[in-house]
Amino acid sequence: MEIPENIQHQLNQFQQLQQQAQAVTMQIQNVEVQIQESETALEELNKTDENAEVFKQAGNLLIKVDYAQAVEDMNEKLETLKLRKQTMARQEERVMKKLEEMQTNIQAAMQGLQGE
């Protein structure tokens, strides 16, 4: 049985959407790791005396920063990462919903072919 061109096109779109879903999932996992690292760094920073020397990594350099500024920077970074994760989670949800819809449509089209 040969698959009609329109169904083949839907299958190609479905595969592209699957790849997009995988990419979004990987990005979410990456952000989750960054969130964990930032939370750990912030916890360690909060355990540190406010008068202690604090350094921030900038590329290959460590730069001395003010303790309060370091805490503020880490909190901002953490907030940004959490917002990014929420945005990506919504994107993942939309992609997964679209995948389910496409799968249903493709299955219905294939069953229609078998009924012919």
UniProtKB/Swiss-Prot annotation:
One of its GO terms (cellular component) is cytoplasm. One of its GO terms (biological process) is chaperone-mediated protein complex assembly. It is found in: Cytoplasm. SUPFAM superfamilies: Prefoldin. Heterohexamer of two alpha and four beta subunits. PANTHER family: PREFOLDIN SUBUNIT 6. Molecular chaperone capable of stabilizing a range of proteins. Seems to fulfill an ATP-independent, HSP70-like function in archaeal de novo protein folding. This is Prefoldin subunit beta. The gene is pfdB.
